[in-house]
């Protein structure tokens, strides 16, 4: 869309209204780049995003996003091979933290159906390794000691050397007190010195670093600390070199992910912008309009967003309506009405909410043109008429059926008769070309054109003759009328003079009386419509209140049910645990047959109440996830007090964590969680026993290929129980060859199981060492 219309309608000022609601520099940049589009799919997407964000705010009214700075330049430097400094790493660290918080928020989100927003939430990346690396930089811009073992070693040596210097100087302060001007340790040129009286300067061996202005004090670094100070200076150089190496190393680790991080930053900004739109809706009672497929416009109680205390008006630009001609005197708000229509269309086509009531519809226009104001006449020293005509000629050459045209004071600035004729001719040309046009004029001749011409409608701005002030109410379908006689009377002009004047234009008076009647009818209709709207608003408020109450009651009910289910589940679990222990004791002390033990266990399970399926229990899910650490969680290593990030879990249950550049192996008791991430729910896989029939009787097969070790062992245990219950004499276990870990686990399990008579690898033609055949005791 042409830039001139955006300047004329002051679209940048409108966009500035959304800035206070933004939290990120990425969102601010996207807002500033925002422009209207004629692509219906993009507009629909923007509208859908706003509606989903509104629904999200109903459930999460305090939803927020971590503030972030622009990182496009940082990522570009990385891609070009540059190494980052600490400040740049802190910007990236902030973006990764914002991304992780949004992912966690989305994972915990309930009772909201998302589609467009889900797409953005799910495109965010997870970088647990990088998060651990970036923990090396604290928010004060300091590289932590744990960033590398070498850095920690150097800083320990610096600390020890500085302690030695302090100790030596403190001893000298006591020993040489009478030779010093003050009993303090001073600092000169980065060295620790003693303030020695000039008369004793030769009594204390060392390096002179400064002399006081009076010459009475000489600042000497004692010989005893010179060597230590030189060591410290050397260590400081080593520290700087190691810090530079750390910056280079972490830059290399981040570099492959620069594009992904930049994309995450854009998504964060996009979500921030959508959030800002909804905050604007809440603040200004704006709405997401409907999108018309045929350029039909219906604006209910629409306001100009930049006008304080703006009067709300209705505008209906039907599919067949080509032109709306607003007639009547100046200063009544005609120009504001033009700008309101144009600006509302620009806002909607830019994916922004509009200041109107629900039920409002907007069209889609490829271009919006306007001739408003006298900018050209000032710039080019042209007359008002020449300025308008120059602009209109240019516009007429560009408009088509997909354009919206706004013309202010059409035909003004020349002879009234010629100006009116030109205005009608221009409107007729636009009508025949089916170009939607809203025009303002003060020529009375255009009233007749609006009445007599098909697909053209008159309109006016209401004027209160009692107060002699415009009300700024838009009256569609009612042409403007002159109020000169009424105003003259109220201002004290003689009734005789007013009467003489009115007799000279009897015909016009007849027209004015008709217009007056139309105004009265329009006002009456508006009052009725306002009353209907008030009732609708009350009904909407009542409906919202009832829905809110209903949802709250349902939540309370669900909470109580969940508590009861949890208690019941705990009781059942406790009973089953006790039954397992009893059966274990029986098995170790008695000669019960295997199938009798399994049958007894099954009977005990039947005695317990039916176990409630808590897989959908939100409370339990959150409690479990809160207790269990997961990959990507931030941790504090208890022995060091340093932060890191979990990167993987080992087979023995221990965890690998990235703490700066150091990778550590920790047990759960050696760290605390800082903020757990919500992992995606993983459906439990059932162990399926596939029965087959052959000459040897009932058999079964279990396939463990592709399973993790713990998962495979659990499935094997359940499978053997089921096989014994079915009195199977023999089963096949397919574990594959692979690394041999699962095969070895199967072997150890079968060796321990007292119900197994024998087992061995399958024949070569039946799987060989990739499968084990198990025979049970009779």
UniProtKB/Swiss-Prot annotation:
Keywords: ATP-binding, DNA-binding, Endonuclease, Hydrolase, Nuclease, Nucleotide-binding, RNA-binding, rRNA-binding. ATP binds at residues 328-335. Residues 702-777 form the Smr domain. Endonuclease that is involved in the suppression of homologous recombination and thus may have a key role in the control of bacterial genetic diversity. Belongs to the DNA mismatch repair MutS family. MutS2 subfamily. Homodimer. Binds to stalled ribosomes, contacting rRNA. This is Endonuclease MutS2. It comes from Streptococcus pneumoniae (strain ATCC BAA-255 / R6).
């Amino acid at each position: 869309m042409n830039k001139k219309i955006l300047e004329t309608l002051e679209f940048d000022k409108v966009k500035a209204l959304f800035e206070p609601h933004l939290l990120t520099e990425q969102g601010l940049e996207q807002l500033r780049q925002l422009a209207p589009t004629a692509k219906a799919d993009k507009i629909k997407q923007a509208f859908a995003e706003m509606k989903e964000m509104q629904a999200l705010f109903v459930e999460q009214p305090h939803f927020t996003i971590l503030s972030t700075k622009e990182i496009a330049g940082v990522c570009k430097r990385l891609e070009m091979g540059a190494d980052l400094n600490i400040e740049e790493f802190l910007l990236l660290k902030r973006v990764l933290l914002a991304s992780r918080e949004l992912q966690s928020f989305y994972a915990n989100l309930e009772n909201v159906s998302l589609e467009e927003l889900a797409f953005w939430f799910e495109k965010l990346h997870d970088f647990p390794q990088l998060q651990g690396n970036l923990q090396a930089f604290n928010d004060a811009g300091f590289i932590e000691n744990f960033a590398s073992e070498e850095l920690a070693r150097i800083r320990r040596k610096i600390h020890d050397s500085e302690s030695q210097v302090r100790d030596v100087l403190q001893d000298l302060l006591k020993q040489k007190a009478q030779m010093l001007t003050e009993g303090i340790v001073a600092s000169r040129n980065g060295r620790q010195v003693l303030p020695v009286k000039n008369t004793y300067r030769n009594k204390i061996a060392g390096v002179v670093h400064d002399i006081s202005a009076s010459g009475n004090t000489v600042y000497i670094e004692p010989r005893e600390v010179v060597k230590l100070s030189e060591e410290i200076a050397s260590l400081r150089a080593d520290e700087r070199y190691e810090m530079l190496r750390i910056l280079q190393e972490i830059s290399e680790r981040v570099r492959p992910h620069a594009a992904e991080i930049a994309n995450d930053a854009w998504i964060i900004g996009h979500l921030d912008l959508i959030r800002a739109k909804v905050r604007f809706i809440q603040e200004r009672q704006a709405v997401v309009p409907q999108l018309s497929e045929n350029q039909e416009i219906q604006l209910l109680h629409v306001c100009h967003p930049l006008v304080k205390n703006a009067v709300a008006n209705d505008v209906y630009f039907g599919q067949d309506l080509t032109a709306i001609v607003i007639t009547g005197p100046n200063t009544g708000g005609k120009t504001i009405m033009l700008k309101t229509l144009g600006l509302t269309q620009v806002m909607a086509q830019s994916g922004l909410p509009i200041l109107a009531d629900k039920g409002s519809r907007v069209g889609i226009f490829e271009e919006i043109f306007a001739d408003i104001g006298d900018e050209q006449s000032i710039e080019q020293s042209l007359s008002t008429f020449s300025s308008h005509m120059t602009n209109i000629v240019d516009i007429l050459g560009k408009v088509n059926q997909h354009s919206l045209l706004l013309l202010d004071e059409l035909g003004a600035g020349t002879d009234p008769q010629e100006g009116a004729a030109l205005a009608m001719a221009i409107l007729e040309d636009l009508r025949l070309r089916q170009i939607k046009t809203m025009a303002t004029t003060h020529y009375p001749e255009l009233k007749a054109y609006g009445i007599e011409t098909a697909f053209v409608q008159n309109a006016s701005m209401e004027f209160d003759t009692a107060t002699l002030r415009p009300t700024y109410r838009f009256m569609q379908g009612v042409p403007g009328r002159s109020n000169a006689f009424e105003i003259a009377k109220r201002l004290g002009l003689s009734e005789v003079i007013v009467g003489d004047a009115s007799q000279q234009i009897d015909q016009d008076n007849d027209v004015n009386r008709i217009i007056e009647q139309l105004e009265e009818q329009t006002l009456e209709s508006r009052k009725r419509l306002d009353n209907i709207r008030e009732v609708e608003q009350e009904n909407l408020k009542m409906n919202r209140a009832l829905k809110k109450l209903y949802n709250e009651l349902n939540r309370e009910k669900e909470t109580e049910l969940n508590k009861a289910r949890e208690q019941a589940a705990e009781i059942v679990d406790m009973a089953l645990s006790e039954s397992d222990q009893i059966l274990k004791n029986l098995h170790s002390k008695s000669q019960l047959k295997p199938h009798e033990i399994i049958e007894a266990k099954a009977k005990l399970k039947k005695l317990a109440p039916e176990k409630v399926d808590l897989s959908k229990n939100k409370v339990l899910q959150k409690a479990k996830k809160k207790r269990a650490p997961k990959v990507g969680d931030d941790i504090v290593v208890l022995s060091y007090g340093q932060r890191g990030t979990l990167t993987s879990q080992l087979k023995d249950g221990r965890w690998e964590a990235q703490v700066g550049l150091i990778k550590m192996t920790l047990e759960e008791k050696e760290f605390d969680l800082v903020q757990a991430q919500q992992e995606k729910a993983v459906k439990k896989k059932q162990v399926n026993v596939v029965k087959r029939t052959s000459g040897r009787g009932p058999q079964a097969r279990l396939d463990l290929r592709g399973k993790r070790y713990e998962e495979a062992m659990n499935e094997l245990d359940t499978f053997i129980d089921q096989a014994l219950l079915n009195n199977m004499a023999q089963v096949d276990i397919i574990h594959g060859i692979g690394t041999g870990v699962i095969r070895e686990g199967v072997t150890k399990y079968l060796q321990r199981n007292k119900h197994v008579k024998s087992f061995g690898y399958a024949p070569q033609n039946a799987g060989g060492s990739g499968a084990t055949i198990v025979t049970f005791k009779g």
